[in-house]
């Protein structure tokens, strides 16, 4: 599961770095937000899976669900 997530993230970052355009502005903003979250200065301050959180930005590549960072593939 982690390998699949890592491959997806790598492919997304490669598509962003090559200048590939997305037709949907919302998708583009989401991809930019993901890139900024993973590569930005706050990336060192985020928690991994099962860490305590208040919002999605508190989690590294995960979602904040009921005060805990969870994998993006697990629904709240």
UniProtKB/Swiss-Prot annotation:
Q: Which GO MF terms does the UniProt record name?
A: toxin activity
Cysteines joined through disulfide linkages: 46-60, 53-65, 59-69, 64-76
Example of a GO cellular component annotation carried by this entry: extracellular region
Please verify whether the record's keywords include Plastid: no
Chief location: secreted
- Which tissues is it found in, per the record? Expressed by the venom duct.
Could you say which residues form the signal peptide? 1-19
**Which residues of the precursor form the propeptide?**
20-42
Task: List where in the cell it is found.
Answer: Secreted
For this UniProt record, give its keywords in alphabetical order, as a comma-separated list.
Answer: Disulfide bond, Secreted, Signal, Toxin
Q: Which domain of life is it from?
A: Eukaryota
What does the sequence similarity comment in the record state about its family? Belongs to the conotoxin I3 superfamily.
Q: What is known of its domains?
A: The cysteine framework is XI (C-C-CC-CC-C-C).
Name listed for the protein in its UniProt record:
Conotoxin Ca11b
């Amino acid at each position: 599961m982690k390998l699949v997530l890592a491959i997806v993230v790598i492919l997304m970052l490669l598509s962003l770095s090559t200048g590939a355009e997305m037709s949907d502005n919302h998708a583009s903003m989401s991809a930019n937000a993901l890139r900024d979250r993973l590569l930005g200065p706050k990336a060192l301050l985020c928690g991994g899976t099962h860490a305590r959180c208040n919002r999605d930005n508190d989690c590294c590549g995960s979602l904040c669900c009921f005060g805990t960072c969870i994998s993006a593939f697990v629904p709240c």
